[in-house]
Regions:
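A glycine-/small-polar-enriched, mobile loop at the entrance of the PLP active site in fold-type I
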Residues: 37-40, 55-73
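PLP-dependent class I/II
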Residues: 2-4, 8, 12-14, 19, ...
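Generic structural signal for well-ordered alpha-helical scaffold segments
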Residues: 24, 78, 82, 108-109
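Conserved N-terminal alpha-helix of the aminotransferase class I/II PLP-enzyme fold
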Residues: 64-97
Length: 397
């Protein structure tokens, strides 16, 4: 009997996409579901960016694009990195990919050999360990729990590094927790990493502009770290362009050349019209980015306030992104008489079926005591969702 490859069978399906799909199916049945499982802004792409895309269509940007991306877009990314982050790159040190997800995977596949270890602080984005496994590497999970604001310490990093370590994947601001590493915390991690120049850092900075505690700081900005860091970023979150599928990597030229070789064999260049839209995003008026950030911060404050009023939840204070990651383990072992809650996946499914609110269990993110709620939705939806959750949890004994 024909079977899927062992490589594919090693991969787990995306829990976030699975919950979003389940939510969509219930909505199609006429059920009023509030979807707080999705990881994308609810805003529309700014008009000036859409106009640039329309102009690109009229100017017949409809052919294959260069594998690493149009030079003008890469120049815009280089300028962004210099002006916003104080980092000097050339266009040969930048590659554009089909969304941030492909870019992260490109970097992993370009550097990780079978048997190599990749350090991943938990909680983590669901796809990181799966990408490492796809490359034949071994994910080394470092638990950074609620009590340490979900951030790995320098001591934990030092203890996790072995002779097999190839990479650290670091996401700040974080999906799923919203935690942001401070400049001082990144400096401490950098001091450890500089003692191990063979270990690369894949810095996922896709939520860079959704930051509530000040200007973003990249670990690549730490003295002596730039050649050890590959930055992954893109337009999806900051510019509400998730469906345009444009991300980028910036790093040492030899690594970017490797990613170019890889990308050339399995996706080639990204959508030409999307690239022109992304170029506009980086070069035109940036006021919409700040307007969306302010709205997310207001929603953050609202959901934290309301969630703290729900008995049994221990609520974190996100410093960035648009996720809340509360502890829900006080409900484990409880039941509504029909269904028992044994773990965070059960907890999230109970909320979907009983409260009609879609969330994601923390098991998928490497922290079984918590669950993730996205507040990339309206204030009204946040208020109604927490009300439903509170009522549903009140039925558990």
């Amino acid at each position: 009997m024909a079977q899927l490859s062992d490589r594919l069978n090693r991969l787990a399906p995306s829990a976030t996409l699975a919950m979003s799909q389940k939510s969509s199916e219930m909505k199609a049945q006429g059920i009023d579901v509030i979807n707080m499982s999705v990881g994308e802004p609810d805003f529309n792409t700014p008009d000036n960016i859409k106009q640039a895309a329309k102009k690109a269509i009229d100017e017949n940007y409809s052919r294959y694009s260069p594998v690493p991306g149009y030079p003008d877009l890469r120049k815009a990314i280089v300028a962004k990195l210099k002006n916003e982050n104080g980092l000097e790159y050339t266009i040969n040190e930048v590659i554009v990919g089909t969304g941030g997800k492909q870019c992260v995977c490109n970097a992993v596949l370009a550097l990780v050999n079978p048997g190599d270890e990749v350090i991943i602080p938990a909680p983590y984005w669901v796809s990181y360990p799966q990408m490492v496994k796809l490359a034949g590497g071994t994910p080394v999970i470092v638990n950074a729990g609620f009590d340490q604001d979900f951030k790995m310490t320098a001591e934990q990093l030092e203890n996790a590094i072995t002779e097999k370590t190839k990479m650290l994947i670091l996401c700040s601001p974080s999906n799923p927790t919203g935690s942001v590493y401070s400049k001082e915390e990144l400096a401490a991690l950098a001091e450890v990493l500089k003692k191990h120049p063979e270990v690369f850092v894949l810095a996922d900075e896709i939520y860079e502009h959704i930051n509530y505690i000040g200007k973003h700081h990249s670990i690549a900005q730490e003295p002596g770290m730039k050649e050890q860091v590959i930055i992954a970023n893109g337009v999806s979150k900051a510019y509400a362009m998730t469906g345009w599928r444009i991300g980028f990597l910036a790093g040492p030229e030899w690594i970017i050349k490797g990613c170019n070789k890889l990308q050339g064999q399995y996706t080639s260049g990204t959508c030409s019209v999307s690239q022109k839209a992304a170029e506009a995003a980086y070069t035109l008026d940036q006021s919409a980015v700040e307007e969306m950030r302010v709205a997310f911060e207001r929603r953050r404050n609202l959901i934290v306030k309301l969630a703290k009023e729900v008995p049994g939840l221990e609520v974190n204070m996100p410093q960035g992104a648009f996720y809340l990651f509360p502890k829900c383990n006080s409900y484990f072992g409880k039941s509504n008489g029909e269904k028992a809650i044994n773990n965070s996946t059960d907890f999230a499914m109970y909320l979907l079926e009983e409260a009609h609110v879609a969330t994601v269990g923390g098991d998928a993110f490497g922290d079984p005591d918590c669950f993730r709620m996205s507040y990339a939705t309206s204030d009204e939806n946040i208020v109604e969702a927490i009300k439903r959750i509170k009522e549903a949890l009140g039925k558990l004994k």
